């Protein structure tokens, strides 16, 4: 019985990977030279592929990429990234909304429909009020840019809350307001700037090259001004690289 269940799960996960199809372009990639020369940077659009959401989950309002929030799942970048700087702006449209991005991900969904990698959390401020346990509020740091490994990816938190790393300053804005994240990823180390200040980080990630994913997790969210600046490669082992997808 266990063998049959295992085979069924493998078939399911394989079907999720094979179902990935091109959706749209959103955001741009540029090289490091763009930061150190006076020339206008050559920017290449980023192509996105559906992993397990659906074409109707995502649409554009002007320059904003809007995610409806259902079904739960992710879309992924066309290519993998190792060392890079990611600038992304986001705003929730509902109180307590939940979303995020995954970096260094395999983009293969697990049983909870989400992939492995390091998650860069994006929660609306009222989330803590809506998720009390026995009348006790979760730590406010939940909603100000947590970082944590998921799906078997391990990290060392700069500011530990268990295995997660919490923000050391409350800087996120509430629903309807734009937040700016700058995520610097280099050789297994991630530093997160929230609205103009670095307030969180992790190190020694066991996965250091993979896809970038945008998350659909139950609530509408807007994204805009996604820019990725690629940095020079570092030394990684095969075990630290997510498998390539077709």
Functional labels for PLM-detected ranges:
Residues 4-13:
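Sec-dependent N-terminal signal peptides
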Residues 13-19:
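Sec/Tat signal peptide C-region and signal peptidase I cleavage site
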Residues 20-246:
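Carbohydrate-interacting regions of secretory-pathway proteins
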């Amino acid at each position: 019985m266990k063998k049959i269940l295992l085979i069924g799960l493998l078939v399911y996960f394989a079907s999720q990977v094979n179902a990935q199809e091109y959706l749209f372009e959103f955001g741009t990639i540029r090289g490091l030279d763009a930061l150190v020369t006076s020339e206008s940077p050559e920017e290449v659009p980023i192509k996105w592929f559906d992993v397990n959401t659906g074409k109707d989950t995502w649409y554009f309002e002007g320059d904003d990429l809007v995610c409806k929030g259902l079904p739960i799942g992710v879309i992924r970048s066309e290519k993998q990234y190792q060392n890079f700087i990611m600038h992304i702006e986001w705003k929730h449209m509902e109180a307590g909304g939940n979303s995020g991005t995954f970096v260094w991900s395999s983009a293969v969904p697990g049983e909870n429909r989400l992939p492995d990698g390091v998650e860069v959390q994006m929660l609306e401020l009222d989330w803590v009020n809506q998720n009390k346990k026995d009348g006790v509020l979760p730590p406010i740091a939940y909603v100000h840019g947590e970082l944590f490994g998921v799906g078997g990816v391990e990290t060392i938190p700069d500011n530990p809350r268990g295995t997660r790393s919490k923000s050391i300053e409350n800087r996120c804005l509430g629903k309807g307001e734009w937040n700016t994240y700058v995520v610097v990823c280099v050789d297994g180390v991630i530093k997160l700037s929230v609205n103009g200040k670095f307030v969180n980080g992790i190190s020694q990630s066991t996965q250091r090259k993979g896809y970038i994913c945008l998350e659909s997790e139950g609530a509408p969210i807007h994204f805009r001004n996604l820019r990725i600046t690629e940095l020079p490669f570092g030394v990684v082992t095969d075990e630290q690289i997510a498998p390539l997808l077709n």
